[in-house]
Every structure is written in structure tokens, then in C-alpha cells.
Amino acid sequence: PDITNFKLSHSEYFDAFVIGLTATPALHTTNIFGAPVFTYSYREAVIDGNLIDHEPPYQIKTKLNTEGIKWKKGERPKVYDPETNTIEELAELEDELKFDVESFNRAVITSPFNRTVIQELVKYIDPQSEEKTLIFAASDEHADTIVNLLFEEYEAIGVDVPQDAIKKITGKAYNPQELVRLYKNEKFPNIAVTVDLLTTGVNVPAITNLVIMRCTNSRILFEQMLGRAT
């Protein structure tokens, strides 16, 4: 059944006051509860001291993440297989194949792009600082790649990083809830790489840096991601 109709039928059947509270209002919210009777904006919360403001974003631009990827008819693209850690050449293309910026960020994960971004990040993020960093990846495999590259690039610039300082925290990680507990309460991990697990429902006041290495067209999801550090 349609979830909106399902919720409406329940709210109309029971004789009780219904109060809805949400930080990310969407169309289905007003369909169920009607127009909001009270709103408390992000800016008001910042002024009142309940939230903190964020600085302007630092954008790392490359040719790939601004122009996308385009292969011409007859070319043989090379792809990376994370399961075998090898690069394979595809069959000759019968038609032109183009990935726009959104598709690139979601599905086309290239080693040079990731390494370029990580090389820039390690200049600004101290893996032993009291300030914590949360990185949003496009997929679980992408998260693994980011973790490995972080260790490699810190080593390349002569920064010694404890093994527990950088962790992937996703649903596929071993004992993810314990990792969340450590991230919230202990010094390490200092840098966490996630996909969706830490998007909502987690409050880690020490998070100071948010790094978004994925694309989203969802305003609600973006606000939830931004809320991890505000």
C-alpha cells in the first residue's frame, strides 16, 4: 500500500492528537500533517546557539568531476575491478558512451581522481587531531579505496598514522556499531569513511570536517549529511 495513505488512514482512525516533528520536511510530510504550524530554521538555531554555522565549502575540482567522462565509438575503455585489484580492458564500444558529472560520481570511480582528491585532503586534515573528520563515499568499495589511499598518501608526506586512526564505518564493516561507539567516544578513529550509515541518527560533536566524495540530488540527504557537523 501507499505509505502516505497508510499513515493517513491510521491518523484518521484513532481519536488522538497527532504531532509531527521533522528536521527534513518533504512533500509526504505535508500530505499527512498539512502545512507546518511552527518552523524553527537552521539560521535561528545558529543564532540561539543550538547549532553552529559552517564555513564556505572548499571545492577540489578536477577535469573529470567537472566535465564527466566520454569515450568515443571504437575505443576500448579500461576499468578497475576492486575484487581482483586488476585493470581490465573492455570490448570495443559500438556507440559513444558518456558519463555526466552525476553518473561519474556515482558509478565511475577512477584511481587518479581519488588519489588527486586524497593528496589534497592530507594537506589539511591531521589524523591525530582532536577534531574529527567524516568522509562520505559513493559505495562500500569506494570507501575501502579512500581508506587505503589515505594511509598511502599520509605515508608519502611522512606523517605516521596509527592503524586505528582511519576506519571505514559502513553496514558491511565488521561490528559497525562498535566502530560508531569508538568514533563517538574515543580519540580513534579520527577519520571515518562512510556511505549511508552515519548520515542520520549519529551525534558526534567532535566532527569538524565533512568531506563529500559522492553526488546527491536529494536536498534532504544533503541536509542530513551537513547536519553531522553543525
Predicted regions located by residue number:
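Short, conserved "post-DEAD/DEAH" coupling segment immediately C-terminal to helicase motif II
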Residues: 1-17, 27-28
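Alpha-helical scaffold elements adjacent to nucleotide-binding pockets in ATP/GTP-utilizing enzyme cores
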Residues: 2-9, 32, 41, 45, ...
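Short glycine-/polar-rich loops that comprise or flank the Walker A/P-loop
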Residues: 13-17, 35, 48-54, 130, ...
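Structural recognition of the conserved hydrophobic beta-strand(s) that form the central parallel beta-sheet
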Residues: 16-22, 192-193
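Conserved nucleotide-binding/hydrolysis micro-motifs of P-loop NTPases
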Residues: 23-28, 60-65, 140-142, 173-174, ...
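Interdomain helical connector at the RecA1-RecA2 junction of SF1/SF2 helicase-like NTPases
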Residues: 30-130
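Conserved C-terminal RecA-like helicase domain
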Residues: 85-88, 96-194
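Conserved RecA-like P-loop NTPase helicase motor core
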Residues: 165-230
